[in-house]
């Protein structure tokens, strides 16, 4: 899986954040095809009235489907963890749906034959 990390609105991505993204989203990479592409955007909301000012947005491009997750947290590391968990849940749900459809189709063909 190819991972592309971007910093938006003047947010700079340092080596520590890059390593954290690789580690946490690598778990998602084991669940999907090696051809999948993941784009993650990290940014900081500058409004002091917003408590959860650190934002992580992830877009996972798979064959035939695009999964998105956007999470906010007071700390960027926590926002990355939340996005990774959400994407992992979405990938599992998508995989289970595909498996159920494939199995239902196979059973229908066996009954018809």
Give, region by region, the residue ranges found by the protein language model:
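N-terminal, polar/charged subdomain of small-to-medium soluble alpha/beta proteins
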Residues: 1-113
